[in-house]
C-alpha cells in the first residue's frame, strides 16, 4: 500500500512538504527514479522498490520506527529535549533538535563536495549490507540536506503534542 503523504510528496515538482503535513511511519522518499522514462508519473510501491537489489541507481529512504530502532531512539531523544526545554524557549528547543540531527547525520557541512563523497561511500556500504536500495532513515549516519530535513521533520513532529509553539503546535 502506498503512503498517501509519499504519493503527495512524489507528485510535487520540488518534493516539498508543508509544515502541517505529518510524516508518519510508512512514508518513503524515492530519489533518482523520476528520471527513468518508464516511471514518469507513477510512484512505485515500497514492495517493488524493496525487491530491487542494493546496486540500483535510485535511493529510497523510509520512515518506519517499528523496524528502525535507531530512528526510534532519535525520536525519544527529541522528545526528551522537548520536555527539557521551557515552553517559552522554543528557539532553544529548535536549536537542540538541529544539533541532534547534525550530530547524527555526520556533523556540520563545511564543504558540500566532501559530504557528498562521504554520503556516496556510506550509501554504497548500506545498500550492500542491507541488500536493498531502501534505507531506514535512522541508519543514515551521513546525510545530505534532504536526509537532514526529513530527520528534523520526523523529530519535530514526534514532539508536536509535547510543546506549543506560538500559533503552531510543534
Stretches with model-predicted labels:
Residues 119, 123-128, 156:
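Charge-rich, low-complexity amphipathic helices
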Residues 80-81, 122-123, 161-163:
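A short linear-motif detector with a strong N-terminal bias
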Residues 114-123, 151:
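Acidic/polar, low-complexity linker and loop regions
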Residues 1-117, 128-140:
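N-terminal accessory/pre-domain segments preceding catalytic cores
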Residues 143-170:
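Hydrophobic/aromatic-rich core segments of domains that either
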Amino acid at each position: 500500500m502506498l503512503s498517501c503523504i509519499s504519493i503527495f510528496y512524489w507528485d510535487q515538482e520540488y518534493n516539498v512538504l508543508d509544515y502541517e503535513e505529518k510524516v508518519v511511519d510508512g512514508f518513503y522518499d524515492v530519489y533518482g527514479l523520476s528520471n527513468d522514462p518508464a516511471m514518469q508519473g507513477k510512484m512505485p510501491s515500497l514492495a517493488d522498490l524493496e525487491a530491487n537489489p542494493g546496486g540500483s541507481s535510485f535511493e529510497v529512504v523510509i520512515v518506519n520506527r517499528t523496524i528502525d530502532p535507531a530512528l526510534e531512539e532519535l525520536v525519544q531523544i527529541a522528545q526528551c529535549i522537548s520536555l527539557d526545554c521551557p515552553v517559552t524557549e522554543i528557539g532553544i528547543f529548535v536549536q537542540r533538535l538541529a544539533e541532534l540531527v547534525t550530530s547524527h547525520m555526520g556533523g556540520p557541512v563545511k564543504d558540500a563536495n566532501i559530504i557528498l563523497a562521504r554520503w556516496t561511500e556510506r550509501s554504497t556500504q548500506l545498500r550492500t549490507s542491507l541488500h536493498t536500495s531502501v534505507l531506514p532513515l535512522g541508519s543514515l549516519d551521513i546525510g545530505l540536506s534532504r536526509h537532514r530535513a526529513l530527520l528534523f521533520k520526523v523529530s519535530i513532529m514526534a514532539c508536536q503534542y509535547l510543546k506549543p509553539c506560538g500559533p503552531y503546535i510543534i
